[in-house]
């Protein structure tokens, strides 16, 4: 950008969803480098094993499936209107926690979830440099809306956290920090139902419902007048869907 022009971008928003690979969602997108597979039920029957060890063998032990445009039409619309990354992969070939750490620290000391997801979080905490602390050193603001891995990092443990639902309220009021990490509530995260989850909520894992939640967050940014000065990234934490 020319030095005599101010940067129009004042807000970075990262919306983090759960457990879907590129081919699982966008394998049929026209012109994308994707693969066509069997059409999945919506929601999927259950969450497949996607630990690091499972990743090493899933190509030979499971049937790969995918969703199509009629399941997630707004995601396809975003992909057509903006940018779709078809050579974009999870940082760690494993489950949620390592990749959630990657999103805030660009590093992960683990390749699988800690026992019981380390909830409640206990010691030892990870001594990692992090993007939020780098922002603070530059005098920039940030907020965590619904993310759990922040508490695993020593310098972030105990920092203010906001509920997922707070983001849309703040965005619609035009009150966002410089950088926002936004995580959906469980029933809108698109995370398939855990095989041992006894919940009867029919929305768990429903990708159309999860997409609608994502769209509502984007719409709140527009409502608050922040669209012209914001960049929005929508991503998924791992491939387990």
Question: Which residue stretches match the model-derived regions?
Answer:
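N-terminal pro-sequences and low-complexity stem/linker regions of secreted or lumenal proteins
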Residues: 1-241
